[in-house]
From Swiss-Prot:
Binding-site positions, GTP: 17-24, 85-89, 139-142
Gene this protein is translated from: prfC
HAMAP family: Rel_fac_3
GO biological process, any: regulation of translational termination
Domain (tr-type G): residue spans on this chain: 8-278
Swiss-Prot/TrEMBL keywords: Cytoplasm, GTP-binding, Nucleotide-binding, Protein biosynthesis
Entry keyword annotation includes Cytoplasm: yes
Protein name: Peptide chain release factor 3
GO MF annotation terms: GTP binding; GTPase activity; translation release factor activity, codon nonspecific; translation release factor activity, codon specific
Length: 535
């Protein structure tokens, strides 16, 4: 099959939600319905020692939360689906942001009892800024939840996009009878059960079929009235508006009971876009170009703790990848010939021989590749959009056993390079390493990973710093003067970019007034010392 045909088969999307909306459960059920796994792991089923396929890190299994991003590839209806499961905890929004740069669509999961929640709004803002198409799944209809019309109104009000229901619930909670497929004009009858795949589901055709009101009475009377209202007042589905991120198809269901999952999976194949062109600084890169390009959007250390490995996750942007091909790392100009390249089902890997635009491949390496690196067959290209945001929380870190100092530095270097935490090395001699984060849980996860993956028992201590700004200047002498005058507040990150550590907003304002030739940046791009001014 040629490159354009293979690209047309690809669907690459991320699942996003507020914590506990059921994102991990839906991820599992999509894998189950696509035939990628035989049994769906329940995050809550501790006694059965069964964990979600996408929650593979030890701390995730202990707490039942997603703190790393997982990549899973599966085939369904002659399409190759690349599913990226994002961190569910809000403290890891930076990793989620990076994942959203690697996808062509997003599946938004909303808890029908809670509606649109803060983390959902933040993630949707990122999707809207990138015009990412969004499919919405309103989950947990088998529980006591809010009215569906109210939920649609909230989505439109908070997220600024039109909703187009593809299905509609008949009843809710204990009275949940199923969902009516508006486009196919039939009702799928709800049956509880976590291992069903829908082959034996019961359907009733036609909104005017007397069998439905006979069985579901008042619940259907309300639902049919709402469906008629939707058919009259709601906008028709416009795929161009959907692809522009202005309209979202909406599905209702219960992921834990495998209900409504089939419709979502079909919509991803039928409506989500194949990979499109990507804009580099130098030119537009089209997916069906003959030559390979790819971007490192994630680096993960110790996916296999037994081998202490580091895997670079590369989104293929164009062309065809072949195992052993000669590639150039644009940032360094160095050449590499990766042979042990893998595809993923969470932490399980398989060697692959080829990949196409939209696919995510894993390249094991020992620090050669960094976040934001661009791989090509020789061309020098730069992609932006993978930022480090200025941290808002700081802690100093020391090792309890001085003999493990080297292991601490190795561990923090690797965790810093993968973006799990930001690591700052003070310019002043003798200063403890500083960790910067956007949420408290990041510190806990790093301490846990240092202990379990590197054998380092680290001590975290409070820090007086509240933020940081990377500093540059067109005048090297002006920059050096500022750094000398503020030596106690200067530190270097993992790529040796200088940063000004701040104790209060007033301190930053004073510095900006006193040193007009120095630029203070709230973000730094991955893949080198490229800076921006807005976080």
């Amino acid at each position: 099959m040629n490159i354009p045909q293979e690209v047309a088969r690809r669907r690459t999307f991320a699942i996003i939600s507020h914590p506990d909306a059921g994102k991990t459960t839906l991820t599992e059920k999509l894998l189950l319905f696509a035939g990628a796994i035989q049994i769906a792991g329940s995050v809550k089923a501790r006694k059965a020692s069964r964990h979600a396929s996408s929650d593979w890190m030890e701390i995730e299994k202990q707490r039942g939360i997603s703190v790393a991003s997982s990549v899973m590839q599966m085939e369904y209806r002659d399409c190759v689906i690349n599913l990226l499961d994002t961190p569910g905890h809000q403290d890891f929004s930076e990793d989620t942001y990076r994942v959203l740069t690697a996808v062509d669509a997003a599946l938004m999961v909303i808890d029908a009892a809670n509606g649109v929640e803060p983390q959902t709004i933040r993630l949707l803002q990122v999707c809207r800024a990138r015009n990412t198409p969004i499919i919405t799944f309103i989950n947990k209809l088998d529980r006591e939840v809010r009215e569906p019309l109210e939920l649609l109104s909230e989505i439109e009000g908070h997220l600024g996009m039109d909703t187009v229901p593809f299905s509609w619930p008949v009843g809710m909670g204990k009275a949940f009878g199923g969902v009516f497929d508006i486009r196919r004009n039939r009702m799928r009858i709800f049956r509880a059960g976590q291992e069903r795949r829908g082959e034996d589901d019961e359907f009733i055709d036609g909104l005017d079929n007397p069998e439905i009101p006979r069985r579901f009475g008042a619940a259907f009377a309300q639902a049919s009235g709402e469906i008629e209202l939707i058919n009259e007042a709601a906008p028709a589905f416009d795929r161009e508006a959907f692809l522009a991120g202005k309209q979202t198809p909406v599905f209702f269901g219960s992921a834990i009971n495998n209900f409504g999952v089939q419709e979502v999976l079909d919509a991803l194949v039928d409506q989500a876009p194949a990979p499109g062109p990507r804009q580099a600084l130098e030119r537009e890169v089209r997916p069906d170009e003959p030559k390979f390009t790819g971007v490192v959007f994630k680096v993960q250390a110790n996916m296999d703790p037994a081998h202490r490995d580091r895997v670079a996750f590369v989104r293929v942007s164009s062309g065809r990848f072949e195992r052993g091909m000669r590639l150039k790392v644009a940032r360094t100009g160095k050449e590499m010939r990766p042979n042990n390249v893998v595809s993923f089902l969470s932490q399980r890997r398989e060697l692959l021989d080829e990949a196409y635009a939209g696919d995510v491949i894993g390249i094991p390496n020992h620090g050669v590749l960094q976040l934001g690196d661009v791989l090509t067959e020789g061309e020098s290209l730069r992609f932006t959009g993978l930022p480090f945001f200025a941290p808002e929380l700081f802690q100093a870190v020391e090792v309890k056993d001085p003999l493990r100092t080297k292991q601490l530095r190795v561990g923090l270097t690797q965790l810093g390079e993968e973006g799990a935490i930001q690591v700052f090395r003070p310019e002043a001699a003798g200063g403890a390493l500083l960790l910067g984060a956007v949420g408290q849980l990041q510190f806990e996860v790093v301490a846990h990973r240092l202990k379990t993956e590197y054998g380092v028992d680290a001590r975290m201590m409070p820090s007086r710093y509240t933020s940081a700004r990377w500093i540059t200047s067109d005048d090297p002498r002006a920059l050096r003067k500022f750094m000398d005058a503020n030596a106690a507040h200067i530190a270097y990150d993992v790529v040796d970019a200088a940063a000004f550590l701040i104790t209060s907003p007033a301190q930053l304002r004073v510095a900006e007034d006193l040193y007009p030739n120095v630029k203070f940046h709230a973000l730094r791009e991955h893949g080198g010392k490229v800076f921006g001014d807005k976080a």
